[in-house]
């Protein structure tokens, strides 16, 4: 008799935001078709013994930057999705900081094609508001953008083309972007820092001849972030768009977001492991290797972020994976202004948060909510992604809660892995046994085995009748083979 299931995951404990349960998972054609009491599943082609393991939904990392096509040596969709899979991420939502900027329907289509040809797991794409042309924004939404992203600060010197249509510093432009994005029905994710204040504080540091890591901290203080959140909230009170404050860092920003939420505004927020586990002390110790915008804050701010998560003011945790190679970062010890801001963190979110949970500091169910379910809901992909339930994609992480691993330089898969310094030597409880994307095993025993080009481009569930997942073009197999050959020749995982 032909097996009814393609895959059965048996004997494990599934972990969802609502709680834990001893349930077996049945998978057919890439989707979960059954959650059954132990021993009650029909026959399957493959059965995975998950006794003693936790079964989690794959992470939906909703803040990731791929550097291709202009800087593939830092990261492309091949290496970036390999790194993601190694960290338990099964869906990436990629925010535009690339050249050409993802601010037109044409570039969005090119970026989707690039992702389809290289990705090992599923990828969704943000678009930028561009030149604030209503028909173009509507076209990008109809093509499958998961959301729009803007930055309230200006483009870094020399990177203007990558930020074109993304960096909007004037209130009138932010207001117009809010109006236009509201009409698409999508979310607007916003980097909240005020450029005028950044200019003031940077000028003071330059005038004093300051160029060390502490100068960067002083150049982007909490007030710059708080003013950005306040401006966004005040403008949006008149517009009524759905807005999401990304990589929030400070107690003051949490307070402001909570205030706007209490007034009924559709404002949500995100933070990242960099701010939950790092502080100003780390910025001084690791210098350019943890230079991020906004910068790392005080331990009091860190505590406020955890409180904001527990109380619901902050909805999601994402990596803000923004890779630069180690050689690009190192000159920042003598001149912090000369190096880019960003950490290659897509492989760190799961291990750091699972460790926190397995040590009893936070509930693992909450971690699942913050990293999988909430981002899937927020970006409108929760029908297929982020959940362990019937009908969802079989995106699974099998985690051994009794194992412990030390984070070492050889662990990481990003092309910019040599810039990861701040977590080396850290011991984390919980070790990934395997990761599954749509019912296919993509990691095993620490190796990434998912092939380049197997990933799909995910679009909002609202487009499910037309293009919920954009399938590869007819020539995708050739592109996939070429990408795999290149990865092998470069020694990629």
Residue ranges and their predicted role:
Residues 135-317:
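Histidine/acidic residue-rich metal-binding segments in metalloenzymes
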Residues 1-57:
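Histidine-rich, glycine-flanked metal-binding segment
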Residues 93-94, 124-127, 242-247:
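Short catalytic-loop micro-motif centered on adjacent basic/acidic residues
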Residues 331-335, 341, 390-458:
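C-terminal cap of metal-dependent C-N hydrolases
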Residues 113-129:
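A glycine-rich helix N-cap at a beta->alpha junction
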Residues 214-240, 289, 311, 315-317, ...:
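His/Asp/Glu-enriched, well-ordered alpha-helical/loop segment
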Residues 50-118:
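Metal-associated gating/positioning segment near the N- to mid-region
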Residues 12, 30, 52, 63, ...:
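Divalent metal-coordination and catalytic microenvironments
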């Amino acid at each position: 008799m032909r097996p009814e299931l393609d895959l059965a995951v048996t004997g494990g404990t599934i972990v969802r935001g609502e709680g834990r349960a001893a349930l077996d998972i049945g998978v057919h054609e890439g989707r979960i078709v059954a959650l059954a009491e132990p021993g009650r599943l029909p026959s399957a082609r493959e059965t995975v013994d998950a006794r003693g393991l936790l079964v989690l939904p794959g992470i939906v990392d909703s803040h990731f930057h791929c550097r291709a096509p202009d800087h593939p040596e830092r990261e492309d969709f091949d290496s970036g999705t390999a790194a993601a899979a190694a960290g338990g991420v099964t869906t990436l939502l990629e925010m535009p900081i690339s050249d050409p900027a993802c601010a037109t329907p044409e570039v969005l289509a090119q970026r989707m094609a690039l992702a389809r040809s290289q990705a090992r797991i599923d990828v969704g794409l943000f678009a930028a508001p561009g030149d604030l042309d209503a028909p173009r924004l509507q076209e990008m939404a109809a093509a499958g953008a998961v959301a729009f992203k803007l930055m309230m600060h200006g483009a870094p010197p020399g990177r203007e083309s990558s930020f074109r249509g993304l960096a909007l510093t004037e209130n009138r432009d932010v207001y117009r972007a809010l109006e236009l994005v509201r009409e698409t029905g999508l979310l607007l994710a916003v980097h909240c820092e005020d450029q005028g204040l950044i200019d003031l504080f940077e000028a003071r540091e330059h005038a004093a001849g300051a160029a060390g890591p502490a100068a960067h901290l002083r150049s982007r203080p909490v007030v710059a972030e708080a003013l950005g959140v306040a401006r966004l909230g005040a403008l949006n009170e008149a517009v009524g768009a759905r807005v999401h404050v990304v990589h929030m860092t400070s107690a003051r920003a949490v307070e402001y977001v909570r205030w706007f939420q209490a007034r009924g505004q559709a404002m949500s927020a995100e933070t990242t492991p960099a701010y939950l586990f790092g502080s100003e002390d780390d910025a001084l110790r690791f210098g350019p290797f943890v230079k991020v915008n906004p910068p790392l804050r005080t331990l009091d701010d860190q505590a406020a972020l955890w409180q904001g998560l527990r109380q619901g003011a902050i909805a999601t945790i994402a990596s803000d994976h923004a890779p630069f190679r180690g050689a690009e970062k190192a000159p920042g010890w003598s001149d912090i202004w000369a190096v880019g801001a960003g950490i290659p963190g897509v492989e760190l979110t799961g291990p750091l948060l699972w460790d926190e949970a397995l040590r009893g500091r936070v509930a693992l169910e909450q971690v699942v909510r913050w990293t999988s379910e909430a981002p899937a809901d927020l970006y409108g992909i929760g029908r297929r992604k982020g959940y362990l339930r019937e009908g969802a994609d079989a995106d699974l992480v099998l985690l051994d809660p009794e194992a412990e691993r030390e984070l070492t330089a050889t662990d990481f898969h990003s092309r910019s892995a040599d810039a990861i310094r701040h977590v080396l030597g850290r011991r984390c409880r919980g070790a990934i046994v395997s990761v599954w994307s749509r019912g296919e095993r993509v990691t095993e025993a620490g190796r990434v085995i998912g092939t380049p080009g197997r990933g799909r481009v995910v679009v909002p569930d609202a487009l499910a009748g037309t293009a919920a997942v954009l399938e590869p073009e007819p020539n995708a197999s050739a592109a996939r083979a070429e990408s795999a050959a290149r990865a092998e020749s470069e020694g990629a995982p």
